[in-house]
Amino acid sequence: MQDNAKYWTTTITSHDRLMAVDCRELWRYRDLFLLFVRRNITTQYKQTILGPLWFLINPILSVIVYMVVFGGIAGMPTDGAPPALFYLLGVAVWNYFQACVTDTSNAFVENANIFGKVYFPRLIMPLVSVTTQLVNLGVQLLLFAVVYLVYAYSGEAAIHTTWGALAVPLLILMLAMLAMGFGMIISSVTTKYRDLQLLMSQIVSLWMYLTPVIYPLSMVTNPTLHTLMSLNPVTPLMETFKYCLLGVGDFSWPWLLYSLGVSLLLFFLGLLFFQRTQKSFLDTV
């Protein structure tokens, strides 16, 4: 009986270390993690007529709008890449980043009720958000692959995919770390200052237009403005995605390493803020 009681007893302690992340504890709660991921995926389009088809409909509609408005009316270039592929890739990558930032930034506020009732590692929720959106990204990249094969088979446009396509998983990891880190910082701050939560949608929308999602970075010819836009850590990642999968884009190793450095910095700062906030956020939410 004593052995069983010891086995089923969990001792909760407050760590003094700034970034005390217990990976073994996270692994013990892997079933709960998978349960939350499954719940998030199934509830996204629950009680809708088209159901999971919305995973495909949303990016397709966005691409059509961008092709008509920015490609047709505004006449913005796509660096020689087929417009459908150019916009589809940009939309898929940006949607993943935007959704991860938005979901992670609401981790404390939206889950305060369940956090107050049962114990589990709070870090699970940001990880759930990033993983759930990874499924959406996978579906949209699959759609990109189908359209890519159609263009390649028809021979209507020359597409120069590079060997860098093998590095796409690493680019996704960098994007996830950047989004998760930024989201955790915002989530920690919004437990006391809800104004920031209300501003998040505007901030992310503005961020999109400061990132070469629907236009190529090569279109920015002013050197100063080009450098300022490259300081946006999402910009080098977006351009590298385009370079690897479409053979276009303003790829630069120094800027990519800069983006990696910012991603790591924000990720660890996010962990620091998140770990410190989780001890007392229930008193302020």
Where are these regions (language model features)?
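Hydrophobic transmembrane alpha-helices and immediately adjacent juxtamembrane helices
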Residues: 1-285
